[in-house]
């Protein structure tokens, strides 16, 4: 049996509505796996089946019956389902958002007592078997938790849920045990490949949920005796040197940027899970963190003068397949409420493109793209731009940043226009409008990045110039 299988290495951000300037809830994540592994974007329509459906994983044969009614939802699957679906993130017709997963590790003590289940649920299946069947973030926690309790899980993971009012972070810590914490409305959390939830209040069901029998499991195996101070991270998580160079520095940088901290240690194992920002946050604050690489610190790998530039693993790196910010906006009609901001390829070298999940279709470029380069694929357009910039970052970084700024201005203006018109529409007319405008937004991004590619090719330094 595989004791621990790791499929991705991501960074996540969760933000409560009162911490955002516009009262949105936010869940966001970089999906990191391979340096060239395309993603697509799709919308699964609402469907009612006559018979109960059965899901069978192509990855590990995890099998589960599904309800007859499947709600509409968006998703970002792999270009191939040979190794599983990996739908990763989306928003459903009830305005519920889900992102899965933030890969993590459990310690040998807990896995010895409750091993991972080889054919249990894993990252590749979670969005597919949870998001289309829930009407709130809290329901998402409950459904995923019940699946893990019944079928087990083959991995240690963190999962993000949100709706108009609540943001939840879910963590599985062993084969059948899990906890989840609601992010306070005025707070945020940054997570980076470690079990992150700290003190669990077992008597506060409004803000904590957990698996049946977890108290007995922990007590009977002598993992914890003080349940008034039950620390999930300490009991179930790891505390290794690799955590201190791979994981905690990313949390440190996120908190440094969002809270203005200057006195925390990037290698500390005691960084708090829940934090308050030093200002009301905006979407571009979240985008900045997800695209960051320790800027303005001694650890920035893009600054050749930094002796410690490669000491820590950065948040944005070449293995990022896509990055998403799932924004659920307060007080909006449900079909307009959510925006799935999607950046294909490496976050630092891409742009977040808005997509309204009530749309019926996506741009053709988001439906294609395989293992080899394809200039008709959105993934490969953004990936190529990043590769060209990387080759001569010092010379080309300004051209890239100018493009990113132009795209951000165009698309933010576009969202204002779309919202204003969308609020006057309903039914199929609304969905058709959101489809047309979402595709138009995607086209703007593709046009600007193809222009960038042409510019980079034209101005690339020649061997004679670099002698």
Q: Where is each model-derived feature located?
A:
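Short Pro/Gly-enriched beta-strand edge/turn motifs at strand-loop
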Residues: 68-72, 141, 302-310
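Secondary-structure boundary elements
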Residues: 133-142, 146-155, 279, 296, ...
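Glycine-rich, aromatic-lined ligand/substrate-binding cores of catalytic
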Residues: 225, 230-323, 327, 331
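Substrate-recognition/cap regions that form aromatic- and gly/pro-loop-enriched pockets
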Residues: 305-422
């Amino acid at each position: 049996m595989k004791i621990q299988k790791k499929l991705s290495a991501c960074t996540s951000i969760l933000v409560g509505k009162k911490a955002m300037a516009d009262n949105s809830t936010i869940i966001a994540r970089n999906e990191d796996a391979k340096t060239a592994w395309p993603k697509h974007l799709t919308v699964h329509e609402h469907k009612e089946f006559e018979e109960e459906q059965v899901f069978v994983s192509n990855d590990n044969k995890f099998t589960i019956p599904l309800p007859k009614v499947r709600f509409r939802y968006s998703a970002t699957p792999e270009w191939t389902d040979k190794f599983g679906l990996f739908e990763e993130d989306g928003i459903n017709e009830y305005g519920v958002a889900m992102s899965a997963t933030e890969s993590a590790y459990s310690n040998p003590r807990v896995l010895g007592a409750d091993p991972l289940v080889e054919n249990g649920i894993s990252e590749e299946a979670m969005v597919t078997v949870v998001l289309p069947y829930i009407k709130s973030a809290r329901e998402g926690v409950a459904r995923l938790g019940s699946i893990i309790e019944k079928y087990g899980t083959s991995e240690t993971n963190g999962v993000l849920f949100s709706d108009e009012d609540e943001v939840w972070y879910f963590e599985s810590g062993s084969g059948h045990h899990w906890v989840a914490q609601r992010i306070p409305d005025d707070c945020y959390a940054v997570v980076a490949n470690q079990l992150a939830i700290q003190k669990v209040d077992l008597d506060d069901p409004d803000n904590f949920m957990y698996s049946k029998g977890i108290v007995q499991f922990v007590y009977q195996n002598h993992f914890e005796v003080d349940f008034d101070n039950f620390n999930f991270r300490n009991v179930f998580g790891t505390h290794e040197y690799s955590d201190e160079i791979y994981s905690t520095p990313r949390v440190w940088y996120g908190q440094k940027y969002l809270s203005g901290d200057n006195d925390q240690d990037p290698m500390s194992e005691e960084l708090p899970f829940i934090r308050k920002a030093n200002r009301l946050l905006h979407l571009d604050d979240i985008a900045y963190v997800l695209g960051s690489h320790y800027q303005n610190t001694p650890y920035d790998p893009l600054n050749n003068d930094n002796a410690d530039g490669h000491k820590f693993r950065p948040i944005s790196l070449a293995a990022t397949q896509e990055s998403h910010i799932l924004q659920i906006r307060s007080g909006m009609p449900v079909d307009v409420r959510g925006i799935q901001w999607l950046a294909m390829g490496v976050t630092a070298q891409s742009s977040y493109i808005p997509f309204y999940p009530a749309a019926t279709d996506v741009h053709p470029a988001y439906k294609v793209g395989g293992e080899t380069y394809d200039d008709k694929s959105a993934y490969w357009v953004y990936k190529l731009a990043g590769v060209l910039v990387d080759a001569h970052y010092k010379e080309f970084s300004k051209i890239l940043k100018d493009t990113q700024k132009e795209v951000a201005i165009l698309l933010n203006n576009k969202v204002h226009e779309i919202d204003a018109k969308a609020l006057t529409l309903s039914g199929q007319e609304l969905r058709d409008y959101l489809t047309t405008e979402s595709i138009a937004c995607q086209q703007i991004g593709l046009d600007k990045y193809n222009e960038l590619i042409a510019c980079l090719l034209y101005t690339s330094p020649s061997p004679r110039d670099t002698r």
